[in-house]
Amino acid sequence: MRRVLIRVKGKVQGVCFRRFALERARELGVTGYVTNMDDGSVQILAQGSAPLVEKLIDWCWEGSPAASVNAVEVNEDEADEIYLDFSITQS
């Protein structure tokens, strides 16, 4: 099991990025959440098998059709909480 915090920067708010991230994560079977951040970025907590989490990280560079991604930062996360689904949360 791999668990990461992903920060996606660029034009990623107001372009349905979170909805598309939700759909992609659920397709992959990755759990966690996606949320808008006050600085205009989007944060994703993703947990699942390492290859599937890596696919979600790769997808972040594409994002939603209207998004323009400038940076994707990934940090390993060691928290104990287990997510059973993937959801959109409010910042």
UniProtKB/Swiss-Prot annotation:
Q: Which reaction does it catalyse?
A: an acyl phosphate + H2O = a carboxylate + phosphate + H(+)
Which GO MF terms are attached to this record?
Answer: acylphosphatase activity
Taking every annotated instance into account, which residue ranges of this chain make up the domain Acylphosphatase-like?
3-90
Q: Which keywords label this protein?
A: Hydrolase
Tell me which domain of life the UniProt entry assigns to the organism this sequence originates from: Bacteria
Which positions are catalytic residues?
Answer: R18, N36
Q: What is its EC number?
A: 3.6.1.7
Q: Which PROSITE patterns match?
A: ACYLPHOSPHATASE_1 (PS00150), ACYLPHOSPHATASE_3 (PS51160)
Q: Name one Pfam family in it.
A: Acylphosphatase
The entry's family comment says: Belongs to the acylphosphatase family.
The record's listing under PANTHER family reads: ACYLPHOSPHATASE
Name of this chain's protein = Acylphosphatase
Q: Which species expresses this protein natively?
A: Shewanella amazonensis (strain ATCC BAA-1098 / SB2B)
